[in-house]
Amino acid sequence: MLHFLIRPSTRCAGSPHFNSTSSFLRKRLQSKTILSKRLGFQFRPSSTNVLAEVSTATSGFNPSWWPYALIQNTAYTINVYAGAPWWVSIILTTLGVRLALTPVMIASFRNSTKLSVIQPEMKKELEAIKTAKLDNDQLALNQHSIALRGIYLKHNVNPFAIFILPLTQSAVFFSFFYAIRKMSRLSVDGFTTGGLAWFKDLSIPDPYCILPIINAGLMFSGMQMNRANTASTIGNSTNWRTFFFLCCLLSPLLTAKLPAAIFMYWIPSSLFNIVQGYILKNPVVRSKLGFAPLPSIIEKQPSGFTLITNPIKSLKEFYKGVRDGFKTQYEQLQKDVSRRAVATTSASTIRPNSHYKKLKELNRSKKNSKKQSN
């Protein structure tokens, strides 16, 4: 009944890595030994073997507060205390972290939807600020900057808050990636047999490349769901949709050599995004969370559909769109630089020279008047 804490292992003792979790388990096992002597029976056949199992099971773990170490220790704790296989431990750790990040996600989505609503007002003021900078008009620049800050305060939004969620998710992704990759390379107890179905060994890649393909499809679905929920201008552009689809299409080729354990994080995380997207599409949920309502017209054709039916034409259009976009930006940049140069020259050169000429003419007229008076 009480022997589920540690599973048997065939490895020997003496691992150099022994963290605080292991010392805690050692104390628990010592107390069990004393209790078994008093009761007259043993909880385990041999406490020495159990201690060896604790030592070898923690190979590669560190008592650190870095995010990757916390992820490793959390998954290990679930594996040891619940007796769950490693694929279940990684999935439960993933879901726990994603649930912990839910408040950050809600705050970021609320801010993004408010920004999408006030985008016309923001665009007007930003264009005015840009024009004032090019014309070197400090008065207009200050006026429109104050007006833009007033819009942010009126609607209670922060334009920099949209970066919090992507940065947090990136940090979590790289922490999981590093933690699981390190676990797959080290001799962690039960990792080579802690898989499921055709991927029993979590430390090696999927031999049939099924997990990378499933992950690519779920990533694409999650991107579609988030694009529809935020309804942002960038996410709905044709070029960006094609680019995202190409990334998902090529991801199985780029992730085929990754250990199968990484997909025990990636696939549940993508499923979490899809479920989260379906929940956030509900108008009642959006109103309760303070989200702006979705636009009435959302493109129903899924992005990438044209790429599948006619890939050559779609790739040509994608290349043409990217090229035209860079060309337009370059031409606009040249115009802005020229306009800025003219404004700076007129402010620093033309006005002082004209003023100097007026002073010179005034002094000359004074001298002429003195000569005439004499």
From Swiss-Prot:
One of its GO terms (molecular function) is membrane insertase activity. It comes from the Eukaryota. It is found in: Mitochondrion inner membrane. It is a multi-pass membrane protein. Residues 98-159, 264-374 are mitochondrial intermembrane. Keywords: Membrane, Mitochondrion, Mitochondrion inner membrane, Transit peptide, Transmembrane, Transmembrane helix. GO terms for cellular component: mitochondrial inner membrane; mitochondrion. The chain crosses the membrane at residues 77-97, 160-180, 243-263. The keyword Membrane applies. CDD domains: 5TM_Oxa1-like. One of its GO terms (biological process) is protein insertion into mitochondrial inner membrane from matrix. Residues 181-242 are mitochondrial matrix. Belongs to the OXA1/ALB3/YidC family. NCBIfam families: yidC_oxa1_cterm (TIGR03592). PANTHER family: MITOCHONDRIAL INNER MEMBRANE PROTEIN OXA1L, OXA1. Required for the insertion of integral membrane proteins into the mitochondrial inner membrane. Essential for the activity and assembly of cytochrome c oxidase. Not essential for viability, while oxa102 is essential. When both genes are deleted the cell is non-viable, suggesting that oxa101 act as a back-up for oxa102. This is Mitochondrial inner membrane protein oxa1-1. It comes from Schizosaccharomyces pombe (strain 972 / ATCC 24843).
